[in-house]
A protein has these predicted regions:
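Short linear capping/connector segments at secondary-structure termini
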Residues: 29-32, 86-87, 158-166
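Bacterial Sec-dependent N-terminal signal peptides
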Residues: 1-28
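Conserved, well-structured interaction surfaces
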Residues: 38-57, 77-150, 164-204
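An aromatic- and glycine-enriched ligand-binding surface/loop that stacks and positions planar moieties
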Residues: 21-79, 153, 209-210, 220-382
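Alpha-solenoid helical repeat scaffolds
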Residues: 118, 145, 149-152, 158, ...
């Protein structure tokens, strides 16, 4: 009887615990998908997340794009290939370009779907048009990165469900189809003034109309180049496994060069109208204690080309990467080697041009150094 009484008491206490308000979470503070479009700041943060998949080309640790004719560095991740250290278990060494690109495209399309649900109370129609334009630019740019890395690649036109099997993904499209799609998205981005000509202040680094024009120029140049324009030597058998169609054009087209030239000339003209230009002596401003004058104007121009000018923005840069440089960034690898400790530790000149690059420069007479009779080729290192 006592056991039964104790059991009933315990059971009653458990019932009280289950019905109390102490353990209830009111309100539920877990983030919901709808929170991403409840405020202007949240929507802008969602847009900025679409930029988060841009490759960090300044980080030398992931610089598989470096080639020996451009620069020489030591102890970088890509050296694992030549030393034979790279193995299937070494996946941590790679920058995983493939996944990053497609995740970025997926994020952009998800953002566009969410943007449709945003109330005008938080984001005006004009801002929506601008945000949509930026995401279209990024979709185009990510497809360009995929084409640059892998040639004929997939074209993604909308959100793909995460549960989609491999068989449900689109196959590779031809280079001509990829080029057409990229330019279609860029035209959408630039339509109705969606992209501004330039940004300044905290918005510096976001997509602009000039960046879109520059990208169109680059894409058409790829399409016209011998790599993809009539390359029968390397890609005669590069066909779709499904229907056998050619993925890279086998007939040279002069029209592609004409289109490339027209697009490039237009991009240059528009950039110059916006007051962008090659860096000159005057852009560095007058000498000061912080910026002492150098005896040679060319040295002064080179010194400040990338780091300083009167307005704070380099007039050569059309689309800037404004992310902070990290420990392994290119800036840390360029200054002369430091022997001091503390904050200077690790700074060293580990990035430098190769002799092959230096010898590729022409003389003042416009000739290769081994062809110019006025240049003392035998004593070139003296």
């Amino acid at each position: 009887m006592k056991k039964i009484a104790k059991f009933l008491i315990v059971l009653g206490m458990m019932g009280q615990l289950s019905s109390c308000d102490y353990l209830d979470i009111v309100p539920d503070e877990r983030a919901q998908e709808s929170d991403t479009w409840k405020t202007e700041g949240a929507v802008r943060g969602y847009l900025y997340s679409c930029y988060g998949y841009l490759p960090a080309n300044r980080t030398f640790g992931n610089s598989y794009w470096l080639a020996e004719e451009l620069t020489a560095v030591t102890k970088e991740l890509f050296t694992t290939f030549k030393y034979g250290y790279y193995r299937p278990v070494s996946l941590g060494f790679t920058s995983n370009t493939w996944s990053t690109i497609w995740n970025g495209i997926h994020q952009c399309y998800m953002f566009q779907e969410s943007l449709k649900q945003v109330s005008n109370e938080y984001v005006t129609d004009e801002m929506k048009k601008q945000y949509l334009a930026e995401s279209n630019f990024l979709i185009a740019y990510y497809h360009f990165l995929s084409m640059r890395s892998y040639g004929p690649t997939m074209i993604i036109r909308s959100v793909i469900d995460l549960e989609t099997p491999i068989s449900g993904f689109p196959e590779r499209s031809s280079i001509d189809e990829v080029v057409a799609f990229i330019n279609e998205k860029l035209d959408e981005a630039m339509s109705e003034g969606g992209l501004p000509t330039t940004w300044s202040g905290k918005d510096y680094g976001r997509a602009t109309r000039l960046a879109a024009l520059a990208l169109k120029s680059r894409v058409y140049l790829y399409a016209a180049s011998p790599l993809y324009n009539g390359n029968t030597e390397m890609y005669a058998d590069f066909r779709s496994p499904l229907d056998g169609r050619q993925l890279i054009a086998q007939e040279k087209s002069q029209a592609k060069w004409e289109i490339s030239a027209t697009q490039t000339k237009y991009a240059i003209d528009e950039v110059e109208k916006a007051k962008f230009h090659l860096y000159h002596d005057a852009d560095a401003g007058e000498p000061s204690d912080a910026k002492p004058g150098l005896p040679n104007k060319a040295q002064r121009r080179l010194r400040y080309t990338n780091i300083d000018n009167q307005t704070g923005n380099n007039p050569e840069i059309i689309w800037a990467d404004t992310r902070n440089d990290d420990y392994y960034g290119i800036q840390r690898r360029c200054p002369p080697r430091q022997t001091l400790g503390g904050k200077f530790a690790g700074i060293s000149m580990t990035n430098c041009p190769t002799l092959q690059t230096i010898e590729a420069f022409y003389t003042k007479n416009g000739l290769p150094i081994n062809k110019d009779k006025t240049f003392d080729y035998d004593e070139r290192y003296e």
